[in-house]
From Swiss-Prot:
Annotated region (Possesses beta-glucanase activity, but is unable to lyse viable cells), positions in chain: 37-430
Active-site residues, as the UniProt record annotates them: 153 (proton donor), 169 (proton acceptor)
Domain of life of the source: Bacteria
Main subcellular location: periplasm
PANTHER family registered for this protein in UniProt: GLUCANASE B, PTHR38165
Name of the protein this chain belongs to: Glucan endo-1,3-beta-glucosidase
One of the Pfam families matching this protein, by short name: Ricin_B_lectin
The organism's taxonomic lineage, starting at the top: Bacteria, Bacillati, Actinomycetota, Actinomycetes, Micrococcales
Amino acid sequence: MPHDRKNSSRRAWAALCAAVLAVSGALVGVAAPASAVPATIPLTITNDSGRGPIYLYVLGERDGVAGWADAGGTFHPWPGGVGPVPVPAPDASIAGPGPGQSVTIRLPKLSGRVYYSYGQKMTFQIVLDGRLVQPAVQNDSDPNRNILFNWTEYTLNDGGLWINSTQVDHWSAPYQVGVQRADGQVLSTGMLKPNGYEAFYTALEGAGWGGLVQRAPDGSRLRALNPSHGIDVGKISSASIDSYVTEVWNSYRTRDMVVTPFSHEPGTQFRGRVDGDWFRFRSGSGQEVAAFKKPDASSVYGCHKDLQAPNDHVVGPIARTLCAALVRTTALTNPNQPDANSAGFYQDARTNVYAKLAHQQMANGKAYAFAFDDVGAHESLVHDGNPQAAYIKLDPFTGTATPLGNGGSTEQPGTPGGLPAGTGALRIGSTLCLDVPWADPTDTNQVQLATCSGNAAQQWTRGTDGTVRALGKCLDVARSGTADGTAVWIYTCNGTGAQKWTYDSATKALRNPQSGKCLDAQGGAPLRDGQKVQLWTCNQTEAQRWTL
């Protein structure tokens, strides 16, 4: 299921925290045969946090009915007959694992959340014939305000399992999520860098955004509110993002923003230009198809209100892309959106500091730091169409977390791995191979993709020393760089870390351990002849799947 075509639930989930659970057809995948995915799959929760007791809640919606699931995976609708005044919900808690222990429950087909709390149970209420009132801890009177808790979002249906870590509402207790495939491999995401949990708070407060941080009565940090909530309760100023939006609106009075919302449909484009206070977008035929009023700070941080994105194939995708460009502050620097180069995200001084820091502290750089962080596939989500099991690992608040399963997309820089020895083409896609342009072995000749031909420029020898060689030279990361977008070229073999590679047979990634990043086709899909090759954060996309 392409990230940019799925029905994103992020906006829905963010809205729910303030009021009532009314889940739409969120995270719905391409349907597979009904027999492909059983009614429940095992979910193992491991407690590496060093804290407890842990209480679990599996809450969500099935066929338009909201409810909860017990440890055996049985779904229970919330009681009906409730009026507009909220009443306590039945206790849906499941006893979680103690420190250093694991608990396995059954995860049913739902679109919802798995909550977990530390030390005490959470309070939930129902209203209006069985709708759930979610925690809204931006309100100091919320009964869960002083409880340490977090959650993961998931959808399990006939199309498989989608599960993600999220920071859309707040940054709090660290965790990883994972899915086991039929071949036994575990795809995972959400792991922080060493000491990343506290580093986030320190940097946030140092940047003047400390008003978002909520503390317990004993002074310990509980969470940092997402600015989408903080702006509405006066915890941060709107001045900086307002200034940025004004500059963006003025910039596009005299030039077009070109939105290409679907990576697999490069010919589908919309051009936008500002007229008065309205950003008006046209189709290829010149017809106006969407218009957005100049948004206030709440609309930008929350990707809603003035930037509301309906579940359609025109207005919604344009709104999502425009909001992502504003949140990541790339709208001024790149008129072609979405911006494919994450190295340029959050560089403006007026940027969303919360989102910037959330991505910085993730081991794989992926986060769900705002509602449409999935624009361009930068979200912390894993999916499999035939899931065998799901995992949540509650990580330590300090120190270094252990990667979930085989590491998946959270594999740490420097983790050793094998490179199968041999000689042959390095294939990508159906017809392309890694190629030395013009078969020229000159140092610093940047490698590319080219139609497979079997010539010497496409014959790569993989050594037991981790090198990949062609034409007597080594595949080399330019100047030992570690940043996204660093060129990969051929260079005289010298034994440095810039010339070492490992191969993950599960994800088909060629990874440079020194940088912790992967060999990547510049610009991503669609793959094409002449496309240059670079270093990029490992993301398991088509642009990083190499066949030896």
